[in-house]
Structure formats: C-alpha cells, structure tokens
C-alpha cells in the first residue's frame, strides 16, 4: 500500500476550520485543535439557541399582549379565550405588534370582543 501524505487535503480542511473561527478570542482562532473544538461548540450553541429563540419570542409576545390587555382591565387568558370564542384567528406575534405599534386597532379589537 502506498503512503499518502495528505498535504493539500489536510491543509484545506484546517484552513476551512480556521476561517470559520475567525474573530474568536485568543488562540481559538489561531491554533487548529482549539479552533476545531471552539467551532464544534459554537455550532452546538447555534443549534440550541435557534430553538431557544422561538420560546423566548413567544414569551415576549405574551408579555406584551398581557400588558396591553391589563390596561383595559382584562387578563391575557380571558382575552385569548374571547378571541377564540369570537372566531378571530390572529397569532400572538401579530397581536403583540398591534398592542405595541397600533393601539387604536387593538382597542377596536378589544371592544369587538367585549360585544360578543
């Protein structure tokens, strides 16, 4: 069996990892072994936080809707219940944007729900 030196292939692989870790602190962007470990850890964090972000944004939307509904003497849960009862299908992201950016429309929605 012939000997394979892997010069070009190994250099290309190491360069790819080092380019991915550009901007990392200390030797994590210079030395291949620590850069490789940092890169794997960064990818794990990215995977985890893509899922975490969805949870945190939903929490933020619910908090904003709750704050807006409590200004009109109603809790978040009763507001959502009355929305479902009135067959109004709006997601929490949209409701939160209405509560923050367009309070008049939110109040109209609120008064419509009260009538039902």
Curated annotation (Swiss-Prot):
Q: Name one GO molecular function term.
A: rRNA binding
A Gene Ontology biological process noted in the UniProt record is:
ribosomal large subunit assembly
Q: Where are the transmembrane segments?
A: none
Cellular location of this protein?
Answer: Plastid, Chloroplast
Supply the Gene3D superfamilies for this chain: 6.10.160.10, Ribosomal protein L20
Q: Which domain of life is it from?
A: Eukaryota
Q: Which CDD domains match?
A: Ribosomal_L20
List, alphabetically, the PROSITE patterns matched. RIBOSOMAL_L20
GO CC annotation: chloroplast; ribonucleoprotein complex; ribosome
State the UniProt keywords alphabetically.
Chloroplast, Plastid, Ribonucleoprotein, Ribosomal protein, RNA-binding, rRNA-binding
Q: What is its main location?
A: plastid
Record's InterPro entries?
Answer: Ribosomal_bL20, RIBOSOMAL_L20_CS, Ribosomal_protein_bL20_C
Enumerate the Pfam families for this protein: Ribosomal_L20 (PF00453)
Q: What does this protein do?
A: Binds directly to 23S ribosomal RNA and is necessary for the in vitro assembly process of the 50S ribosomal subunit. It is not involved in the protein synthesizing functions of that subunit.
The record's NCBIfam families line, in alphabetical order, gives: rplT_bact
Family assignment from sequence similarity: Belongs to the bacterial ribosomal protein bL20 family.
* Name of the protein in its database record: Large ribosomal subunit protein bL20c
Q: Which organism is it from?
A: Oltmannsiellopsis viridis
What gene makes this protein? rpl20
